[in-house]
Swiss-Prot record:
This is Argininosuccinate synthase. One of its GO terms (cellular component) is cytoplasm. Belongs to the argininosuccinate synthase family. Type 1 subfamily. Keywords: Amino-acid biosynthesis, Arginine biosynthesis, ATP-binding, Cytoplasm, Ligase, Nucleotide-binding. One of its GO terms (molecular function) is ATP binding. The gene is argG.
């Protein structure tokens, strides 16, 4: 990349150590103006301090946006209509946040006339791929600056030294008290990587977890929760109508208090290596359980089975950074078609780390008590018909035995 061609860069900025250093590094290395963009996607931290830090770094254009509702409504909820899980365990909490951030970076870059966007993802992880693939899908001509792939800073200590050398104000007391884990949080989850978790045999310490009680310490009392669905999306909890973001915030607190949503996973990164991560996803765990219960009542068998076959591919697209790809949008259209009848109420029971479905009802239910009953069905179903059904399905099996 020709550094002289870069006059203005939009940086995905948190105000933390890494991105604070990136501001100065971009200014010095590219001799460019830096515009910062900070998104509130439910990470649970104040975002306004990022404005103060950016101003102190000489940034003139600062964007801070509350994107919680857009994140929940246009990204998380559509993904959950697919019941997407990566490698059978990961609910894609980090993966699904990247397309929205990329989208706003590209939009702001166009708005302010920037030549490039920049992010603080490392050269080893998935996020660099996700940020950039999603950005290129929206603007093929956008230039991307990834400092971790360019500079020679390789550790937290080297970052601290750089900050001290260049007069970047860092709260060293806060840094010393900072979690030893690499963390990422949003409305859907909080993730933990690094430190002792790099040994897949080592159990995480209990004080690592922030959103959930341990199941052992969760209340000895059951909580029942009713969730109302409309066309595949949750619209109310216990009869109270809520926005998508409010649904997730409510479930994070409610389910987290019962120790629901912890997971410890070794996953295959898109870049080729395996990594271990621990996740707290209270709302996602509950939503997935409730959604599958609602679909079990309202979806046709063949449609449900085909949807389940497509789900791993959909999850892989989200994980790898292909949210804006035509194949994901094609699958989304098919999935959304299946959700037209997925409306009704699911009743759940929360208790000590477990979420159990205990009831479901829908005006679109395909469940027939009259047909399935063990009692007299008044001749609706003729059991003699099963003999021909079995014989036809057994034909190929019988042929294998004929010599």
């Amino acid at each position: 990349m020709d550094k002289t061609s870069i006059n203005k860069v939009v940086l995905a900025y948190s105000g933390g150590l890494d991105t604070s250093i990136i501001v100065k590094w971009l200014q010095d290395t590219y001799q460019c103006e830096v515009v910062t963009f900070t998104a509130d996607i439910g990470q649970g931290e104040e975002v306004e301090p990022a404005r103060v830090k950016a101003e102190a770094a000489g940034v003139k254009e600062i964007y801070i946006e509350d994107l919680r509702e857009e994140f929940a409504r246009n990204f998380v909820f559509p993904m959950f209509r697919a019941n997407a899980i990566y490698e059978g365990e990961y609910l894609l909490g980090t993966s699904i946040a990247r397309p929205l951030i990329s989208k706003r970076l590209v939009e702001i870059a166009k708005q302010v006339g920037a030549d490039a966007i920049s992010h603080g993802a490392t050269g080893k992880g998935n996020d660099q791929v996700r940020f950039e693939l999603n950005a290129y899908a929206l603007n093929a001509d956008i230039q991307v600056i990834a400092p971790w792939r360019e500079w020679d800073l390789s550790s937290r200590e080297s970052l601290m030294d750089y900050a001290q050398k260049h007069g970047i104000e860092i709260d060293y007391k806060k840094q010393s008290k900072k979690s030893p884990y690499s963390m990422d949080a949003n409305l859907l989850h909080i993730s933990y990587e690094g430190n002792i978790l790099e040994d897949p045999w080592t159990e995480p310490e209990e004080d690592m977890w922030r959103w959930t009680l341990s199941p052992e310490n969760a209340p000895d009392k059951v909580e029942y929760v009713e969730m109302t669905f409309k066309k595949g999306d949750i619209i109310a909890i216990n009869g109270k109508v809520m926005s998508p973001a409010s649904v997730m915030e409510d479930l994070n607190k409610r389910a987290g208090a019962h120790g629901i949503g912890r997971d410890d996973i070794v996953e295959n990164r898109f870049v080729g290596m395996k990594s271990r991560g621990c996740y707290e996803t209270p709302s996602g765990t509950v939503m997935l359980k409730a959604r599958r219960a609602m679909e079990s009542l309202t979806l046709d068998r063949a449609a449900a089975h085909l949807k389940d076959e497509l789900m791993p591919k959909y999850a892989e697209m989200v994980y790898n950074g292909f949210w804006f790809a035509p194949e994901r949008e094609m699958l989304q259209a098919a999935i959304d078609k299946t959700q037209e009848t997925v409306s009704g109420v699911v009743r759940l029971k929360f208790y000590k780390g477990n979420v159990t479905v205990v009831g479901r009802q829908s005006k679109n239910s395909l469940f027939s008590e009259k047909i399935v009953t063990f009692e007299n069905d008044d001749g609706i179903y003729n059991q003699r018909d099963a003999a021909g059904f079995i014989k036809l399905n057994a034909l190929r099996l019988c042929l294998n035995t004929i010599k």
